[in-house]
Amino acid sequence: MLADLFERLFPRQQASRDTVKQRLKLVLAHDRADLSPELLQKMRQEILEVVSRYVELDSEGMELSLENDQRVTALVANLPIRRVKPATAEG
């Protein structure tokens, strides 16, 4: 009963465990994909620049990560869209 109370009052242990697990997955994916953190950051910036030409993004919810299974490493972008920008004439 007391343990349940502590678990409810201090649930961060599970969250921190999940955070560590996600960080480890990211490090492993970086190693397997041979992407440096600097290159990943540059890719992130360029992706955001291109997407921002067409839509307004919610910067708080943005997330870019590498996910890895046994065969494939995937770059996953979660980019919350606030609104689509009006079409502009490009030359």
Curated annotation (Swiss-Prot):
Gene name as annotated: minE
HAMAP family, per the entry: MinE
Function in brief: Prevents the cell division inhibition by proteins MinC and MinD at internal division sites while permitting inhibition at polar sites. This ensures cell division at the proper site by restricting the formation of a division septum at the midpoint of the long axis of the cell.
InterPro entries linked: MinE, MinE_sf
Protein's recorded name: Cell division topological specificity factor
Keywords carried by this UniProt record: Cell cycle, Cell division
Single Gene Ontology BP annotation: cell division
A Pfam family it matches: MinE
Domain of life: Bacteria
Family, per entry: Belongs to the MinE family.
